[in-house]
């Protein structure tokens, strides 16, 4: 490679993250950071919480907290802040009927009936486990949507206003009631498209350790 500027190989998390590079070898590599995603099982039909995953942008946090307070949810609201956020700044905005947790994300996925949030890759992880995801969009600000096109309107969807959230809650509750296995099946397909299990075989192959 001239000047040694380009890498010999680029590893991506999954087949659908392909960059279409012309001059550099591109391969799917093990998703080392997401190894727990392949260990946990989720069943939204048995979920007993609505998991709210907050990003680290102040305006976005305020928008989500303001919106979720206006919804009559079908399960307990459990809020997980981004680890870089000072939670005490938002205490006054969280009703006593909601709870805040610092428990392991994958433990919470195992209890989740739905996941609500914005601009965080953890929502892709949730959908990959077959958990319905509501992506909150701020109408007055550019929103970073990490969700892939796959599963839109079936496994995940975006909401801007309270009425949008209510519609999606009803839709996802019906999906959970009628055919939760379909959600799990779509989740498995998403996981296979966007993540690669870090097994000994995939690690050896990706890093040429043979």
Model-derived regions, located:
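Active-site and donor-binding regions of nucleotide-sugar-utilizing enzymes
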Residues: 1-37, 123
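Catalytic binding pocket for nucleotide-activated donors in carbohydrate/polymer assembly enzymes
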Residues: 5-7, 23-24, 28, 94-95, ...
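Structural motif
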Residues: 9, 49, 113-114
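Helix N-cap/beta->alpha junction signal
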Residues: 13-16, 83, 119-120, 161
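Short, acidic/turn-prone active-site loops that include or flank metal/cofactor-
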Residues: 16-17, 31-35, 102-106, 138-142
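Conserved catalytic-core segment of nucleotide-activated headgroup transferases in glycan assembly
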Residues: 26-93
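Donor nucleotide-activated moiety binding/catalytic core segment of transferases
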Residues: 83-129, 133, 140
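C-terminal alpha-helical cap of glycosyltransferases
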Residues: 177, 192-210
